[in-house]
Each structure stands twice: as structure tokens, then as C-alpha cells.
């Protein structure tokens, strides 16, 4: 009787030899991109060896109620065929043992360790599994011979250098295996779903769209100074794209057109060097929504989008741009057809789309994750162009692991990385101080796209920094409010939610409040309202936390910024006179009446104070000053390896002993240990849309992945101690363990225009954003 790998509800069976052969071939195809197809093929052949067990066969045929573990047998067999003292003997076992449960630790840590799996191997049992005639190819399979990374010219020196990235090579092989396994299983079990994959436009076709779009945009643009500068930046990007793959920096002041210019570079570079896709990683979801719209349609203006769709004049089109972040609801995007929605849902699993717009969290947590679902996409990073937008926002406490993995992607997997920012951080050479330092990107390894960023900064200077209010603390928030009321259109950015709420309460009616106490759906509504008011010349006073700083295309004549790090000040300046319509806008730097939160914010502000003293309060936002700022700032930090990347991954890399799962559990760019998510009640004043039906379903326990995806737009993060307090008061309920929502009987907890309001709970208001 033929052995079965899968069985559908209607009784169709996929034989084990067929599945393992399919997975081996697809897996090896994926790994050809980094010249290790033989490793992938071998892993694919052996990955389901455990399904040859008679007990498992009875289970799949419905003759036995319980299953047995099937992932360990292939791992043990591969290990038994090698010298157990050879570190390379562990490689295939990592892949196979984790192909369902996730990459394991070598030592006991989080879950079953690989060491324990390989310590008790029953050779007669494994040989018995291979007696079936349809597993003959598994018995005859040869152990892989290609060198890691496909480097057949390894010397002792460069092999030692590449060891830093050995874990990444294993992750890439693992990604090939789990994606191939998922895809072949899907193809058999749900062929209709499988048929929706692929069939994207090529990057060459998308470049033609882009060139036509930019030609028309340029032809219709006014002959202003700023548009001429943007055109020059665009041309620099196109010129440098022909150079060799590697690290590049795009150092352009805010408002210089980085979104489109960086894409111009990426498209030209990808076609010149046969890259497969372009990935734009961004720090905030609010920027992603805006950027994804620009790439899909050519604009982020909703009315213009409707017109472009009707006229079939979209830039890359909805089907070719994958927007992947926690707040994106495919089913709620009315612009997308059903087929495109389903196709994009599938593409989030393995990033097969040509253009991907995602978060830093999604990108880097996937690169250090151990779970199969998160790792599927990794092999599609090979031979890609990754644009890191607002690179200064990379969290310093994870910088060591982030720069290490970026170096590995560039050096070993054909990736080109573009570091895109208005405030280029110091990421080259030794970073930090004597007490805490590490080696960043090697000196002179980053190619600047802009030859003279200092001259460009001068050309694009559109604001004056007024430091009159920064020398002494302002007396109180009323003093700040009085200053703001002198202007009809003004943006004020403060440090914390508490400061934002307090200052807003002192402002005239009609002043807009913006903070992360408001759900993403309302923040989008508010940003649209701000743009409408500014566009029509209406009064527009806004009090916001720093979430408005990065990439939100709003243009105020006057901006007030609470004293902060120089990078934050520069980002605030990017919301001022953005289009250069005034001779210059003014950014007022002020010393707030409240204390600056301790930690990175406080340290950044202290470096700025030192620079203000050094430059006699005459602050010019130049690349030279940013370099000085970041160098001093990093020297104040005492930890660049919060996740313990060194001890968990690098310490015993030469022995191939990795704590994959423990690192995965520790790797959270946004610290959720002390915070929880609350789903709130919101009705849009702009569209009339509300989420009552979603909350009702959640309250009734009618939950699935799609419901949580929809609800993500209506969530607010709070400290867990405040969630506990609100639960006691009955203002929050917990319909499912660990899931919190606003009580359906409490209409006052969330208020449009303010967000979550709870006077009895004070501590949550001190959080930034």
C-alpha cells in the first residue's frame, strides 16, 4: 500500500513519495538563488520521513485517533549519516525538526531542544521507515556537497568572517523548506487557493509604468525651485543605480521627494542587476498607509485615487503592491477587487509580490523569528532591494543584531540596502563608547547617492530654527497655549500623551488632538481632516505626540517642538513649509514645563542641549551636525544588544549551536511585555463607519483571524496595569482570555477627537506617541 502524506475531506490522497519529491524540487529551486540547491533538496526529501511510521499512516487514513510526531525522524536520520562531531551535521536537523514547530534551540530553552532530539537516535527504527519501496530515493540520497553561501572558494580567513552570518544561512534554508512544504500542501489540499498565487507584473513592466508616470508628473509640475531640486535628486538616484549591489545612503532633507526617488533607484538598480523584488520598510504604520497609496495609485489623495482607478491610470496598481502590516484590513479595502484581496492575503505569507511596503517590525522580527509562518518569506529577500525609510528610527537597543543581519544579506544573499533618511545616523565603523560598543557597517562600504548632501541641505532649507524658548523651562502649558494661539495654522509636537491632552485642553475649540490614544482608523481620519483644512486655508491648530513626525505629508507655516533629540527636531521641521511656498517657515524649539521622559528621549534631548551650547543656540540642520549628534548620542547608550544576539547566536556559532527559539521569544522591537491591546468603540465622523458589529462578534466569542485583522484598525495600546484597573471598574471586559475590549455599555471610555479617556487611570497618559 502506498504511503499517504495528505488526505482531503473528500477522500483524495497525496502519496508521501510524491509530496517529498515535490517539496525537494521546489525547495531546491528556491535555494538556487544562493547556490545551495543540494542542501535544500536533501532537506525536502527527508522532511516528512516520520510520516512513514505505521502509526502515523493509520492516523492519516482514519484508522487511529491520535497522531505521532513526524518531524524528528528525518532530523535524526540526517544526523546519523554524518560524523556527529562535525558541526555541519546539525544543519539539516535544525531545518527538519523545526519545519512545523519552528526552528529549535540547541540547548534546552524554549521548547524541545535539538540536542535532546539528536541524543537518543533509534537506528533500527529509522532503517525500518526506509524499507518502503516508494522511499527508495530517500535511501539513496547523497548528503549535500556545496559550501555554505555557495562560496566554493572559501579560505580560512573569509570562512571565519562569514561565520557571523551562519545562522542567517540556516534561516534561509529553513525558509525554502517551510515555504515549499506549505505551497505543495496547499496545491493539493486547496488547489483553488494555490491558483491565485503569482502572475505579477515584472519589474521591467513596472518601471515602464513608473517612467511614464514621472514624465507626466514632471511635465505638469510648476517650475519652482523645490521641483527643480527634486528633479535633480531623482536624476542622481537613476545615475547611481547602475553601480554594484551593496549598501547605499539616500540622504535627502524632508520634502525632497524620497518616496519616488528611492523607488526610481530601486527599479533601475533591480533591472540592471537582476534583482527580484523591492521591499520598502518603514517605522510607522501611519507612513505605510500613505506610502503604499502613492505606489499603488501615484497619490495619497482619496479623491484623486478614485479618479485614477476609474481612468485606469494607477502607478503600479493594487495587485502589484503588497501592503503588509498589522493594521491593514484586506477585506475592508473597498478599492480592491475580491480576487486581488485574496491574492494579497496569500502574498503576505511569503512575500512573492514585486513591491512590498511593510514595517521595520515585520521585516526584522521575521529575520530573527523561529516560527515557520514568519520565516516563509525570508528566501524571497534574496536578490532584492531593501529600502529602509527613516533609518534613524531603527531602535538603538537592537542595532547590533539589525546591522549584523543587514551585512549578512548584502554580503551573502545579493541584497542591496538603501538607507533612506533626512538625518543620516552614524552607522559606520565602531558605534558606541568604551563601555558598550560594536562594529557597524565597515567604513566606506556605504555608497552615497547624493554626492554633496551639505549643499543639498542648504538648497532645500525652508525653515529657520528659533531657539528663544529653549533656554529656560516654560512656566506652564498655558504659556505654550498662548503662544500657539498667535497663529491660525500651527502644529505643536510634545513628548507624551499626557502633555498632549493637557495642552489640548487649554486650546480654543476646533483645535485638533492627535496621539496613539486614538485608534488607527481615527488617526487616518484626523490626518485627512488636517490636510483638508491646510489645503483650503482654514484655521488648523494641531497638538500631537511625535507620531506625526515621520513621513506624514502635512505642511504647516509654523511648528512648535518640545526640546528633543536632533533627529526628532529635524523630522518636525519636515512638517513646516514642506512645499517651500513661504520664504521660510519657523520651527520654535521650546523647553516644556513637564519633564522629558527618562531613557532614550531624555538622552537625545541632553545631546541637543550640549549642541545648542556649543553652537551658541544657532542651530542649522546639516548632515555634519546630524553625524555629530548621533556619534554623541550612541556614546550615551549602554546596550545595543537587548535581545542577547551575541550570547544566543554568535557565542557558539563555530559549533553550529544556536538558540533560535529563545532569541525569537526575546526579539520584539516594540516592547509588549508591559503593554496590552485594547479594542475600542469608534464611529467615524467623516464617513459614518463604525465597528459595533466587530465588537459584538468579539464579545460573543465569534473570533477568527479575519476579525482580529479588522479590529486592528480599532486598537489602542495601554500599560497592563491600567488595563487591570479599567477591568476592575467594568470599563473594559475580557471576552476571551488575554483579549480586552471596551465595554459595550460604556460609550464614554473612547471619545472621538480625544481617543481613550479614563480620568481614574493616570499612568497610561505618560506614554509617548
What do the PLM-derived regions correspond to, one by one?
Residues 244-266:
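Walker A/P-loop
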Residues 276-300, 325-328, 426:
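Conserved Walker A/P-loop ATP-binding site and its immediately adjacent core
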Amino acid at each position: 500500500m502506498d504511503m499517504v502524506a495528505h488526505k482531503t475531506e473528500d477522500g483524495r490522497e497525496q502519496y508521501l513519495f510524491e509530496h517529498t519529491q515535490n517539496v525537494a524540487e521546489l525547495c531546491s529551486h528556491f535555494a538556487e538563488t544562493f547556490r545551495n540547491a543540494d542542501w535544500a533538496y536533501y532537506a525536502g526529501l527527508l522532511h516528512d520521513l516520520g510520516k512513514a511510521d505505521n502509526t502515523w499512516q493509520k492516523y492519516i487514513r482514519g484508522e487511529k485517533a491520535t497522531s505521532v510526531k513526524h518531524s524528528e525522524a528525518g532530523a535524526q536520520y540526517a544526523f546519523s549519516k554524518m560524523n556527529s562531531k562535525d558541526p555541519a551535521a546539525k544543519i539539516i536537523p535544525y531545518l527538519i525538526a523545526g519545519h512545523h514547530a519552528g526552528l529549535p534551540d540547541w540547548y534546552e530553552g524554549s521548547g524541545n531542544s535539538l540536542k535532546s532530539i539528536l541524543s537518543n537516535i533509534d537506528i533500527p527504527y529509522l532503517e525500518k521507515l526506509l524499507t518502503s519501496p516508494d522511499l527508495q530515493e530517500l535511501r539513496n540520497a547523497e548528503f549535500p556537497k556545496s559550501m555554505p553561501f555557495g562560496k566554493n572558494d572559501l579560505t580560512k580567513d573569509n570562512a571565519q568572517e562569514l561565520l557571523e552570518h551562519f545562522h542567517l544561512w540556516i534561516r534561509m534554508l529553513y525558509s525554502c523548506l517551510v515555504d515549499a512544504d506549505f505551497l505543495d500542501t496547499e496545491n493539493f489540499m486547496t488547489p483553488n487557493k494555490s491558483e491565485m498565487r503569482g502572475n505579477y507584473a515584472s519589474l521591467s513592466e513596472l518601471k515602464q509604468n513608473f517612467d511614464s508616470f514621472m514624465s507626466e508628473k514632471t511635465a505638469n509640475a510648476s517650475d519652482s525651485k523645490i521641483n527643480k531640486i527634486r528633479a535633480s535628486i531623482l536624476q542622481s538616484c537613476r545615475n547611481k543605480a547602475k553601480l554594484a549591489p551593496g549598501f547605499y545612503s539616500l540622504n535627502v532633507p524632508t520634502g525632497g521627494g524620497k518616496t519616488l526617488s528611492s523607488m526610481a533607484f530601486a527599479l533601475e538598480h533591480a533591472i540592471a542587476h537582476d534583482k527580484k523584488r523591492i521591499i520598502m520598510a518603514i517605522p510607522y504604520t501611519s507612513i505605510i498607509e500613505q506610502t503604499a497609496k502613492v505606489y499603488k495609485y501615484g497619490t495619497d489623495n482619496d479623491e484623486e485615487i478614485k479618479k485614477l482607478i476609474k481612468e485606469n491610470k494607477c502607478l503600479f496598481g493594487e495587485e502589484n503592491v503588497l501592503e503588509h502590516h498589522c493594521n491593514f484590513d484586506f477585506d475592508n479595502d473597498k478599492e480592491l477587487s475580491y480576487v486581488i484581496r485574496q491574492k494579497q492575503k496569500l502574498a503576505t505569507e511569503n512575500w512573492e509580490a514585486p513591491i512590498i511596503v511593510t514595517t521595520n517590525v515585520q521585516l526584522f522580527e521575521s529575520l530573527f523569528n523561529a516560527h515557520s509562518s514568519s520565516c516563509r518569506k525570508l528566501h524571497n529577500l534574496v536578490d532584492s532591494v531593501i529600502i529602509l525609510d527613516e533609518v534613524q528610527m531603527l531602535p538603538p537597543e537592537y542595532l547590533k543584531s539589525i546591522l549584523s543581519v543587514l551585512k549578512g544579506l548584502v554580503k551573502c544573499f545579493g541584497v542591496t540596502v538603501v538607507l533612506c533618511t533626512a538625518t543620516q545616523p552614524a552607522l559606520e565603523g565602531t558605534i558606541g563608547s568604551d563601555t558598550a560598543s560594536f562594529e557597524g557597517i565597515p567604513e566606506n562600504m556605504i555608497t552615497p547617492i547624493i554626492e554633496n548632501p551639505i549643499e543639498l541641505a542648504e538648497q532645500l532649507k525652508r525653515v529657520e530654527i528659533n531657539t528663544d524658548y529653549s533656554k529656560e523651562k516654560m512656566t506652564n502649558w498655558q504659556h505654550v497655549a498662548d503662544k500657539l494661539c498667535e497663529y491660525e495654522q500651527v502644529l505643536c509636537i510634545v513628548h507624551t500623551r499626557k502633555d498632549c491632552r493637557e495642552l489640548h485642553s487649554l486650546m480654543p475649540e476646533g483645535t485638533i488632538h492627535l496621539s496613539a490614544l486614538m485608534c488607527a482608523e481615527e488617526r487616518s481620519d484626523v490626518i485627512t481632516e488636517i490636510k483638508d483644512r491646510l489645503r483650503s486655508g482654514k484655521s488648523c491648530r494641531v497638538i500631537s505626540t511625535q507620531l506625526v513626525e515621520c513621513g506624514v505629508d502635512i505642511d504647516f507655516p509654523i511648528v512648535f517642538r518640545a526640546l528633543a533629540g536632533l533627529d526628532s527636531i529635524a523630522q518636525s521641521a519636515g512638517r513646516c513649509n514642506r512645499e517651500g511656498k513661504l520664504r521660510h517657515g519657523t520651527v520654535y524649539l521650546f523647553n516644556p514645563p513637564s519633564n522629558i521622559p527618562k531613557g532614550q528621549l531624555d538622552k537625545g534631548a541632553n545631546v541637543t542641549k550640549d549642541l545648542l551650547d556649543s553652537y551658541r543656540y544657532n542651530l542649522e540642520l546639516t548632515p555634519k551636525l546630524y553625524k555629530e549628534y548621533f556619534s554623541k548620542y550612541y556614546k550615551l547608550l549602554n546596550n545595543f544588544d537587548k535581545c542577547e544576539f551575541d550570547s544566543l547566536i554568535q557565542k557558539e556559532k563555530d559549533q553550529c549551536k544556536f538558540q533560535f527559539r529563545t532569541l525569537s521569544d526575546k526579539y520584539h522591537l516594540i516592547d509588549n511585555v508591559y503593554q496590552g491591546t485594547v479594542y475600542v468603540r469608534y464611529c467615524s465622523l467623516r464617513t459614518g463607519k463604525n465597528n459595533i458589529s466587530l465588537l459584538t462578534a468579539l464579545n460573543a466569542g465569534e473570533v477568527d483571524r479575519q476579525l482580529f485583522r479588522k479590529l486592528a484598525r480599532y486598537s489602542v495600546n495601554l500599560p497592563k496595569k491600567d488595563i487591570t484597573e479599567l477591568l476592575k471598574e467594568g470599563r473594559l471586559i475580557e471576552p476571551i482570555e488575554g483579549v480586552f475590549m471596551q465595554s459595550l455599555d460604556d460609550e464614554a471610555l473612547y471619545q472621538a477627537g480625544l481617543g481613550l479617556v479614563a480620568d481614574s487611570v493616570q499612568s497610561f497618559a505618560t506614554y509617548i506617541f
